[in-house]
Amino acid sequence: EIKKYCNESNLNFQPIDLRWGVSNEAQLDQKTLELCLEEVRESKINPHPNFLIMAGDRYGWIPLPYLIEKSEYEAIVTNIEKEEDKELLNIWYKLDENQIPASYILCERKNEFVEYLNWEKVENQLRDILQSSVNKTSLSKNDKEKYFMSATEHEVIEGIFKYLNTTPFQESILQQNKTLLQIDSENVYAYIRNIKSIDESYKNNFI
């Protein structure tokens, strides 16, 4: 129905599922989130409406930070109480002095951790360690948030909140509709619509 509606309006509807199509290599290199965010950035090239999210009640996967600046990482490690937790974190995060600024990078998955079920257990442990420790630091709220944000929330922020400048097309729409000009567009990040009257046979397709 969406594609039909767009065709009638001389628009091209091209849905992209950011959770499918990520290569095994990218997953093993811990680059999944960055690839998804890059896809969102690419969508901004188009002048017409380019970011639509249909969200359900699932918050989704919370990825580990791929990169943690050295000072931030050391502040976190200082607040880890158990030595085995420090050791686990230091096994998976390695200092890269070539980064500017120097940062700790999440290691790629190798050997038995190529198998997702094996990696999932370690990933959950690392996430718990980082989340519990970062809350004990004096880092800013913004710096702490990335340890708790789902991939979907990262994408929404990239697609909406980092795209606040009005495009020429949006400006033309505003000029055509004087009512919209009365809205404080600097504080309007999204329009939310609830889908009504979904056929019962399709409801199970939505998560």
Where are each of the predicted segments found?
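Conserved catalytic or regulatory cores that recognize and/or transform ribose-phosphate-containing ligands
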Residues: 1-207
